[in-house]
Amino acid sequence: MMKKYLIGFIAVIFSFSGQAAREFTDQLGRKVVIDDHVERVAVLQHQTLNLLVQLDATDKIVGVMGNWREQLGQNYERLAPELVKVPNVGDLKSVNLESLVQLKPQVVFVTNYAPQEMIDKITQVGIPVVAISLQKDNSSHAKNNVNPELDNEEQAYNDGLKEGITLIGDIVNKPDNAKELIKQTFDSRDIVARRLKDIPENQRVRAYMANPDLTTYGSGKYTGLMMQHAGAMNVAAATIKGYKQVSLEQVISWNPEVIFIQDRYPGVVAEINNDPRWQVIDAVKNKRVYLMPEYAKAWGYPMPEAMAIGELWMAAKLYPQKFADIDVDADVNNWYQKFYRTQYQGGH
């Protein structure tokens, strides 16, 4: 009875809006009916928020997650200043339903691991919900898991990113922008692959991704693939699944040659360089502890700029002689001008 009521309620909304409706399948496999022309969206996932900005759909965002600055970095406000005035309506795992309804969004984007009760609360008031995972895997346990076990990580994230960008672009009526974003991402990625193809696995640089509180990424996340594509051997991949805390003794035993730290955790650089216990590690001894630029998003989920220019930056740090003829800064500026419509102003 409730299901029939909701379907009828949605039909009434579409009828009063005077719009035709389209049916989409989100990345959890859910069928979702959405207005033909979408001008008002709410976003409770930072990855989708970043994609909407690059698709030139920022003006359609009427509600946003409360901690988007923390998730995307303090400098992100420069890329999308309009977001500062957008009302907060929840976060990755919760929603302020009253605030959301007042904004009258035509669709709400959530993460694939958003609680089912959260999705139900939104859909029960007649607002369509689209879940985005940016990974595509046939195994059922991967769909709504924050630490998925993927049958084929490479294919899952490549196909998942393409599918996610295409889905979001189609929903917000930016299909051509989505196609161009996908093309640029994978065209740029091929440049790195060609230059690193002859490096044997046992000669790849040992690298470690350092996060606060001795957390790191092992296998099953895009972070590990990013390191792999850039020619690194992720020291945590063999024993760590997903995102987990490790001991300093474990890191010392791995003895990475290079340590990378995401731009949103700048304090970790000083912690590592100033702590006497870390000084026995090759990366620290040889001053190869790098704070990553904002575009090199070593997240659990893939982002197009991370694949296109982030992996290039990382590869150039690991193997500078192989990329000496490439102007990484110029490639970065070109990306920012094309997809963020501004100059890059961060560090390299």
Regions found by a protein language model. Give the residues of each.
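Proline-aspartate-enriched helix->loop->beta-strand connector
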Residues: 89-92, 96-113, 127, 247-264
